[in-house]
């Protein structure tokens, strides 16, 4: 196996789970998520970018995968197809979650992409506010504001009918 193939295999092993979670939350579909991940790794393989650090590589992969998700959503919005059957693929990612966690995840999926991106990177993947800002190429204050708006949206959803107390 040559060095490029070994590098690609190492990148896939290292980052595929994290990128899958990010893309699945955006696309809400296992098959589309896998397509976007394949495109992301092909871009990595063909461009062979140089990175200053592993964090830079990770941020680049997240950025490319998010851009591919946006591109995918734009394309399918313009070229809407009628699904043959509606399959609830959320079961794949929500297996093992309690009802409150499933409802919260469902509400996150329904957020606009700007809010959803910061919520996924900060709360699900675990990046700090500054790291999230670097990845999304926005200011830290913009990340904080979007997180605040996302929390407010979740609170208002819970007040609108869902009641949960720990």
Residue map of PLM features:
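Structural recognition of an alpha-helix C-terminal capping motif at a helix-to-coil junction
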Residues: 21, 35-42, 55-67
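Internal acidic/polar
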Residues: 78-106, 128
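Arg/Lys-rich amphipathic alpha helix in sigma70-family domain 2
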Residues: 63-82, 149
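A short, charge-rich alpha-helical start-of-domain segment used by transcription regulators
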Residues: 1-21, 34
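Residues within the DNA-recognition helix of helix-turn-helix
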Residues: 15, 36, 146-149, 153
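Helix-turn-helix DNA-binding module
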Residues: 109, 113-117, 125-142, 153-156
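Sigma70-family region 2
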Residues: 2, 28, 39-56, 76
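C-terminal edge and immediately downstream basic/flexible tail or linker adjoining helix-turn-helix-like DNA-binding
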Residues: 1-9, 80-85, 134-137, 151-166
């Amino acid at each position: 196996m040559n060095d490029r193939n070994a590098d690609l295999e190492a990148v896939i092993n290292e980052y595929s789970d994290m990128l899958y979670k990010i893309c699945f939350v955006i696309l809400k579909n296992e098959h589309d998520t896998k397509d976007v991940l394949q495109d992301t790794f092909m871009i990595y393989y063909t461009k062979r970018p140089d990175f200053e650090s592993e964090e830079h590589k990770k941020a680049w992969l997240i950025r490319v995968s998010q851009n591919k998700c946006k591109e995918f959503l734009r394309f399918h919005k313009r070229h809407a197809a009628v699904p043959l059957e509606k399959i609830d693929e959320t079961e794949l990612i929500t297996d093992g979650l309690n009802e409150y966690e499933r409802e919260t995840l469902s509400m996150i999926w329904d957020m606009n992409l700007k809010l959803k991106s910061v919520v996924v990177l900060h709360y699900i993947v675990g990046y700090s506010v500054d790291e999230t800002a670097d990845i999304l190429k926005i200011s830290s204050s913009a990340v904080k504001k979007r997180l605040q708006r996302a929390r407010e949206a979740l609170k208002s959803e819970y007040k609108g009918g869902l009641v949960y107390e720990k």
